[in-house]
Design a protein with these regions (language model features):
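Long, ordered, helix-rich scaffold segments
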Residues: 1-303
Length: 303
């Protein structure tokens, strides 16, 4: 099969499982055969699908450890080829951040050491880190709780003017697993003398995407809705907070909280977005419940 055909197969298996037409068995079989692929577009699709599988395992569980091992097996040979070899191929250049990010997730020692070394080389001026890898490297340093990195990046975020660098720092800061650090971001991002109000959404979005901090961010949204209304009411960003909740909430309790909270919000302009968010959460819950045992069995048999 050609590259386009392989991508279409992966995409089709994803959509069919998402909408309940089949389970993830075919997707897992396709992923299992993808470790040798070198095309950046296929690597990117495999990365996205394996990232989605993390929803099906509990944090810090044996199943998550097994999933990380599976992910490592898919990307390790590409890391060896691209990072330890010498290649200027544009396809490989585009694949580098994808591969590095997935191996950091997998807790691969060589990938983590690569991030540590690159960060230390440029600790005095992180803008000099390769821009294609910078977000991955900084996020790895924060996620792995390297001493002093979070505070350094937060102070830099408050002073730096470069938009691309600010976004990379924001992405890194929201990779934290420390709830006190998440609270610091949420509190600090409402101080308009320090940060533009619209930047608050970037922090919320990142913290909601992060499974370790999602509950903290969701709690903040519900308990600071008056601030959101005051700052963004009538603005195009207003419904973004509803969208990000619908995009990431993933438990039965969170669905109940979502429905109860937005039922009490009198905002006709948000009604359609609220309904779409509810439907997204319901569909996600069905997908999780249908496929959790399938992934668990796959990992037991394979690993």
């Amino acid at each position: 099969l050609g590259t386009i055909d392989k991508i279409e197969l992966l995409q089709e298996s994803f959509f069919l499982s998402q909408f309940g037409r089949c389970d993830i068995s075919q997707q897992l079989d396709l992923l299992s055969e993808a470790g040798h692929e070198t095309n950046q577009a296929i690597i990117g699709k495999v990365a996205g699908l394996t990232a989605g599988l993390d929803r099906l395992v509990n944090l810090n569980s044996d199943e998550q450890a097994a999933l990380r091992q599976f992910v490592s097996g898919l990307f390790k040979s590409q890391f060896t080829r691209i990072f330890q070899g010498h290649t200027d191929d544009i396809n490989d250049t585009k694949a580098r951040p994808i591969i590095l990010s997935r191996l950091v997730y997998a807790r691969d020692e060589q990938a983590i050491a690569y991030c540590d070394d690159l960060y230390q080389q440029h600790v005095a001026d992180i803008s000099q880190i390769d821009s294609n890898l910078r977000s991955v490297v900084l996020s790895a340093e924060v996620r792995l709780a390297r001493p002093g990195v979070f505070d350094q990046l937060w102070e830099l975020y408050l002073s730096v003017q470069d938009v691309e660098l600010r976004l990379d720092i924001c992405s890194a800061l929201t990779a934290t697993t420390d709830l006190s650090q998440a609270d610091k971001l949420l509190t600090g991002s409402t101080v308009t003398t320090l940060i533009r109000p619209q930047d608050n959404y970037y922090f919320i979005s990142g913290l909601m995407a992060n499974r370790y901090t999602r509950s903290t961010a969701w709690h903040w949204i519900r308990h600071n809705w008056s601030w959101i209304e005051e700052v963004f009411g009538g603005d195009m960003n207003y419904d973004s907070y509803v969208q990000v909740a619908g995009r990431h909430l993933s438990t039965d309790d969170q669905l109940v909280e979502y429905d109860n909270f937005f039922r009490g919000i009198n905002a006709p302009a948000l009604s359609r977005t609220i309904k779409l968010g509810h439907n997204d959460i319901v569909r996600r819950l069905r997908w999780i419940k249908r496929n959790q045992p399938i992934l668990a069995n796959f990992l037991r048999q394979r690993l």
